[in-house]
Amino acid sequence: MASDQDNSGLDAPGSQFHRPILQSMPDTRQQSFDEIYGPPENFLEIEVRNPRTHGMGRHMYTDYEILCRTNIPAFKLRQSSVRRRYSDFEYFRDILERESARVTIPPLPGKVFTNRFSDDVIEGRRAGLEKFLKIVVGHPLLQTGSKVLAAFVQDPNWDRNAW
């Protein structure tokens, strides 16, 4: 009579179906200081901060500082800081949509028509723009395949009309 362990000889030693029991050994190699505390293999950090309002009356606008830190080769600078207006983000998003038809580009925070220069509105917009950029720069196809992305977050002379 065959036991529960007997699979019609499939696991019998010498059988072509014999599966030896594998013991997993823990990795006991010590990591180096650089491996533990060094920068990750590829990283891209984006921060939208330091909003500033300029102008008077109908000519007022707010711009935002974009701080970028990365070691991805598609980006020319390891660290950069540029300033962009909301309208620049709108153009950038439109360019991304045309350039990257296979990628769904997230929406920007909505336009504000009343109290648009109040601290709460400016902070809400800053947070929304940062969320938008973090999603965009986190997309692997855009990180390496977008021509406009690196320029938008790193080039202080970025010209929306050049795209």
Curated annotation (Swiss-Prot):
Pfam families: PX. A 1,2-diacyl-sn-glycero-3-phospho-(1D-myo-inositol-3-phosphate) binds at R85, S87, K111, R116, R125. PROSITE patterns: PX (PS50195). Its main location: cytoplasm. One of its GO terms (cellular component) is retromer complex. It is a peripheral membrane protein. Keywords: Cytoplasm, Golgi apparatus, Lipid-binding, Membrane, Protein transport, Transport. GO terms for molecular function: phosphatidylinositol-3-phosphate binding. InterPro entries: PX_dom, PX_dom_sf, PX_Grd19_PX, Sorting_Nexin. Residues 42-159 form the PX domain. Residues 1-20 are annotated as: Disordered. Belongs to the sorting nexin family. The PX domain binds phosphatidylinositol 3-phosphate which is necessary for peripheral membrane localization. This is Sorting nexin-3. It comes from Gibberella zeae (strain ATCC MYA-4620 / CBS 123657 / FGSC 9075 / NRRL 31084 / PH-1) (Wheat head blight fungus). The lineage of its organism: Eukaryota, Fungi, Dikarya, Ascomycota, Pezizomycotina.
